[in-house]
Curated annotation (Swiss-Prot):
Alphabetized UniProt keyword annotations: RNA-binding, Stress response
GO terms for biological process, alphabetical: regulation of DNA-templated transcription; regulation of RNA stability; regulation of translation, ncRNA-mediated
The keyword RNA-binding appears for this protein: yes
A Pfam family per the record: Hfq
The name this protein goes by in its record: RNA-binding protein Hfq
Amino acid sequence: MAERSQNLQDLFLNSVRKSKNPLTIFLINGVKLTGVVTSFDNFCVLLRRDGHSQLVYKHAISTIMPSQPVQMFDGEESQGA
């Protein structure tokens, strides 16, 4: 059975969506958005904060900074001891 490959962007967004990890999104115009990713597709990200949803187009995103470390792959262990 062939394993379906995913791109890094989808792995990252799916991980923060599943973990409900709060994040900050910086747009290319300098606007800073914070919230939790509830859904995403090829063109946009649905961000939720304080009971309100915002649809953010990916072409407007500059940087995404999660508030906690992101575990993107199953079996990934913490670094250090």
